[in-house]
Amino acid sequence: MMEPCEYREYREYYRARGKEMVDYISQYLSTVRERQVTPNVQPGYLRAQLPASAPEEPDSWDSIFGDIERVIMPGVVHWQSPHMHAYYPALTSWPSLLGDMLADAINCLGFTWASSPACTELEMNIMDWLAKMLGLPEYFLHHHPSSRGGGVLQSTVSESTLIALLAARKNKILAMKACEPDANESSLNARLVAYTSDQAHSSVEKAGLISLVKIRFLPVDDNFSLRGEALQKAIEEDKQQGLVPVFVCATLGTTGVCAFDRLSELGPICASEGLWLHVDAAYAGTAFLCPELRGFLEGIEYADSFTFNPSKWMMVHFDCTGFWVKDKYKLQQTFSVNPIYLRHANSGAATDFMHWQIPLSRRFRSIKLWFVIRSFGVKNLQAHVRHGTEMAKYFESLVRSDPSFEIPAKRHLGLVVFRLKGPNCLTESVLKEIAKAGQLFLIPATIQDKLIIRFTVTSQFTTKEDILRDWHLIQEAANLVLSQHCTSQPSPRAKNVIPPPPGTRGLSLESVSEGGDDPAQARKIIKQPGASLARREGGSDLETMPDPFDDCFSEEAPNTTKHKLSSFLFSYLSVQNRRKTTRSLSCNSVPMSAQKSLPADASLKNGGSFRARIFSGFPEQMMMMKKGAFKKLIKFYSVPSFPECSSQCARQLPCCPLEAMV
């Protein structure tokens, strides 16, 4: 125990250290655009920086503070950077930070009203504020005479979707037991089926795994939206099979291309068929602060639950997820447990949020949300959304001005998807060139058989200069890729190609071709000082090699198949005419030491036996893939994190260890 005088010294010491940390955070956030966005580290980098065991005696604060830059920052992806475009935003702000600082100091566990009345009541009022700000139906309000619903803060949209599915399952099983009183719940549960689009977030699939409810992923239209016709057809098919439809998860703002499902078509079907309609607006929900963007909410009056993340675009840092339910009693009957030690004198009259969630304990999340709404006001939050949307429009205009690129899906809100015209390997190569420098962070996805790049405007501090700088880096990478592609694969249309002069790797080229419709036609590069794709220190340099799979396909073979088996894998399997043994990222991503040289007289382009040996290593299913297999988005390929000799594991790729092919 500390003596009173020792405690006073301790308190004063950490008061000074707290000010020091606030200054550090201020400096970090104000200069974050100057940092390299992605780290240049490999898995396990941190272990060598730390002792094997915890210290027996206290470390000095100066030593701890110094390790922030020495140990932590070298491995950080800077999500607050204006050059972070990979994922949907995860923003913060000073009011949010200060709110959580206070909440962490109070550190109450607000599972019941009695455990902390302010925690419960502030949350109820703020959730009503937020529902009105977004234009949600009145039945989602706590304080409304005709409402049976209300809102609550959850940790993630993933958890909210699971909660909604569990509540829908419980409600449907109770209705089924009324007709089949002798049936047990497990047999009834086995007949349930839920629906979502094939563009929905992976959390919907995970919710089905946890709840043991079958999930059907339904096809979308040309705009990647789930329509009523597809849902009605699936319901009729499943009823004929003796299944019981129970739940639909509609997405407003899908992960891949920010598409919007048609609530106005799905809602009436759910109402007539008795299905729970859950709406996932994780990213796009913040946009509904702006009345002009609420057209996507048409049909929201049919929703049984709605969720979105203020922790994405609303400048309230993680974790903070808004979740509203139309009928709170259906939620409470799913999660209510009431041991005597959790009861209190006002149990019947007060709201106890422990009955609205999976865990018991809950953080005082509403303080930071309260601070943000009051500090910015609705008008400034709306201006923030409009600014992000305008920056995305500006980037879209830059992409459309360059004939070498295409935009295969309509821009919505702050997300633009684009690709380099031509085979997928070109777009993949552009991403790899960008990743080597680490000056901006982009990730791919696939729509149908096309590899695309997602560009999300994230930071509230993004300027046109930031967008222009990043576009310059993208063009620079594209020029480099196109010049290498044209010089390594001569064709009748490539006769006008101007080869890059020696030593121009990492420098922008004025043009790589002259005229024509070829993707490598003459292109104007917008130059900006101080931004180039110079390779970061310690980065690897894969030598250009002929692709041994090229002759294994006919010219009619889909580009997707070539891309999946050839470009994506072989670039990681070969370096300087040497093959590497590799394993998928589902295993430990540690470079394998065994390398085998190719025979000097072995031709990568000739010899059927060599070709047969290559394909013998792949599952038969891989060779039988159809075009439709690629329509579902492959989300979040984290390109900068690829170890040099590891191949990515995804559903459409061979998920098995790959042996050296010699």
UniProtKB/Swiss-Prot annotation:
E.C. number: 4.1.1.22
Keyword set includes Membrane: no
Alphabetical keyword list: Catecholamine biosynthesis, Decarboxylase, Lyase, Pyridoxal phosphate
Top EC category: lyase
InterPro entries: Aromatic_deC (IPR010977), PyrdxlP-dep_de-COase (IPR002129), PyrdxlP-dep_Trfase (IPR015424), PyrdxlP-dep_Trfase_major (IPR015421), PyrdxlP-dep_Trfase_small (IPR015422), Pyridoxal-P_BS (IPR021115)
Catalytic activity: L-histidine + H(+) = histamine + CO2
Modified residues (N6-(pyridoxal phosphate)lysine): K312
Molecular-function GO terms, alphabetical: histidine decarboxylase activity; pyridoxal phosphate binding
Gene3D superfamilies: Aspartate Aminotransferase, domain 1, dopa decarboxylase, N-terminal domain, Type I PLP-dependent aspartate aminotransferase-like (Major domain)
Domain of life (superkingdom): Eukaryota
Stored PANTHER family: GROUP II PYRIDOXAL-5-PHOSPHATE DECARBOXYLASE, HISTIDINE DECARBOXYLASE
Name of the protein described by the UniProt record: Histidine decarboxylase
Species, as recorded: Mus musculus (Mouse)
